[in-house]
């Protein structure tokens, strides 16, 4: 992001506080947003990652008294019309910037001309803009290529692997640092400074009343040129390679989520940092388990006698089976809870929810049939009527 874009940010809104918020309120708001949207808590959630970054950027300014003062003064000046048009098009000395002179007032003075320098105007404008937009001469540096491309791949896991977490090898083919020149692209390992842009990565051009800056055509905006290209990578600093990396999948990952591995994407050009790797997870359906958040759901068949008389049954879990006690008279369809046998979350562990379902035998031998007839007779003699309280009894 160009520093000139800071003026178009609403940092108070990004933190959800008013412009009169105290230092403590700003700190609390930032911590809350950072905790809720942290990438470790929301693996693969791009929206949460964006909110996390916006909150961090806002707190970097509003959490610093000096920066906040500069920011507030700048926003007030823009709101009052002191600078027309805002900074949507940048300013002189910024990529895509402008400068023009009307009525003896040269707006290039406001931005330190085309050199990225400080302000020389009176009235405190240098104090307002100097801190925000001139963090050092040559602010074009921020527009240079800074990292390699991001990479996305996909994997498929079983339900149990996704619920418990696992590590899995992933095969990738992409740009990797050249071992010969150690990613520099140069035989000597040291690219030369571009003479066209003097290492800034940008050149300026005047067209009448306007001045424009653009990425340097000689170096492509990097500020460096390769005068002695590496024989192996031909000056790129990267070569195509196949590699295998081990990806750690966190517990409880859900179907469709993405896991981000910082710095595991393609290598950056000429020694620049690598991009990120995003692993999209697909989870196969399981014959036994389903899930509801961090809870695991299972339906298990039981006999009528087990429900009527009570007893203990063996129930599978993510690890080893456990014994579940059925109270006498448990109704068909009842769901019983086994605490702590679900999916581990950051602050707690879910439960195993077991629903019992009567399995009615299709064929009975003579002894079983006789026993059931005897039971039915005893049931009638005891006065038991399963439809006694049924709403449709008298219809």
From Swiss-Prot:
PROSITE patterns referenced in this protein's UniProt entry, alphabetically: DNAJ_1, DNAJ_2, ZF_CR
Single annotated GO MF: ATP binding
Segments crossing the lipid bilayer: none
Gene Ontology biological process terms, A to Z: chaperone cofactor-dependent protein refolding; DNA replication; protein refolding; response to heat
Note on how the cofactor is bound: Binds 2 Zn(2+) ions per monomer.
Needed co-factor(s): Zn(2+)
Domain J: 10-75
Superkingdom as given in the UniProt entry: Bacteria
Chain positions of all zinc fingers (CR-type): 165-242
Positions contributing to Zn(2+) 1 binding: 178, 181, 230, 233
Gene Ontology CC, one term: cytoplasm
Keyword Chaperone: yes
Residues reported in the UniProt entry to bind Zn(2+) 2: 194, 197, 216, 219
Metal-binding found in the keyword field: yes
Principal location class: cytoplasm
Cellular localization per UniProt: Cytoplasm
Repeat region (CXXCXGXG motif), residues: 178-185, 194-201, 216-223, 230-237
Keywords from the UniProt entry: Chaperone, Cytoplasm, DNA replication, Metal-binding, Repeat, Stress response, Zinc, Zinc-finger
Oligomer status and interactors: Homodimer.
The family this protein is said to belong to: Belongs to the DnaJ family.
Domain comment in the entry: The J domain is necessary and sufficient to stimulate DnaK ATPase activity. Zinc center 1 plays an important role in the autonomous, DnaK-independent chaperone activity of DnaJ. Zinc center 2 is essential for interaction with DnaK and for DnaJ activity.
Known function: Participates actively in the response to hyperosmotic and heat shock by preventing the aggregation of stress-denatured proteins and by disaggregating proteins, also in an autonomous, DnaK-independent fashion. Unfolded proteins bind initially to DnaJ; upon interaction with the DnaJ-bound protein, DnaK hydrolyzes its bound ATP, resulting in the formation of a stable complex. GrpE releases ADP from DnaK; ATP binding to DnaK triggers the release of the substrate protein, thus completing the reaction cycle.
Protein name as annotated: Chaperone protein DnaJ 2
Gene that produces this protein: dnaJ2
């Amino acid at each position: 992001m160009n520093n000139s874009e800071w003026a178009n940010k609403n940092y108070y809104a990004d933190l959800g506080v008013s412009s009169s918020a105290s230092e403590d309120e700003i700190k609390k708001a930032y911590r809350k947003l950072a905790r809720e949207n942290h990438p470790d808590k929301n693996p693969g959630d791009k929206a949460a990652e964006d909110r996390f970054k916006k909150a961090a950027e806002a707190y970097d300014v509003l959490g610093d008294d000096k920066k906040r003062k500069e920011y507030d003064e700048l926003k007030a000046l823009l709101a009052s019309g002191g600078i027309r048009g805002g900074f949507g098009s940048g300013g002189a000395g910024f990529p895509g910037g402008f400068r023009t002179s009307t009525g003896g007032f040269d707006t290039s003075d406001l931005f330190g001309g085309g050199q990225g320098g400080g302000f020389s105007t009176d009235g405190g404008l240098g104090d307002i803009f100097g801190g925000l937009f001139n963090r050092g001469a040559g602010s074009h540096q921020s527009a240079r290529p800074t990292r390699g491309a991001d990479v996305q791949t996909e994997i498929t896991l079983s339900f149990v692997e996704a619920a418990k977490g696992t590590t899995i090898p992933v095969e990738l083919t992409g740009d990797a640092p050249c071992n010969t020149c150690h990613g520099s692209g140069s035989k000597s390992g040291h690219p030369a400074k571009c003479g066209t842009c003097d290492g800034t990565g940008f050149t300026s051009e005047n067209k009448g009343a306007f001045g424009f800056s653009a990425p340097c055509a000689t170096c492509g905006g990097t500020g460096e040129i390769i005068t002695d290209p590496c024989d192996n990578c031909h000056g790129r600093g990267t070569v195509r390679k196949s590699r295998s990396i081990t990806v750690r999948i966190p517990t409880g990952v859900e179907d469709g989520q993405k896991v981000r591995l910082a710095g595991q994407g393609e290598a950056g050009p000429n020694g620049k940092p690598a991009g990120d790797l995003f692993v999209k997870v697909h989870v196969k359906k399981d014959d036994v388990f389903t899930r509801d958040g961090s809870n695991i759901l299972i339906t298990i068949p039981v006999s009528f006698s087990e429900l009527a008389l009570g007893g203990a049954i063996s129930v599978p879990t993510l690890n080893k089976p456990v014994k579940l006690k059925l109270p006498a008279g448990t109704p068909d369809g009842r769901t019983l809870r086994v605490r702590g046998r679900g999916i581990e979350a950051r602050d707690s562990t879910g439960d195993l929810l077991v629903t019992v379902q009567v399995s009615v035998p299709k064929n009975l031998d003579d002894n079983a049939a006789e026993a059931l007839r005897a039971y039915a007779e005893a049931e009638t003699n005891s006065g038991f009527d399963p439809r006694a309280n049924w709403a449709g009894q008298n219809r």
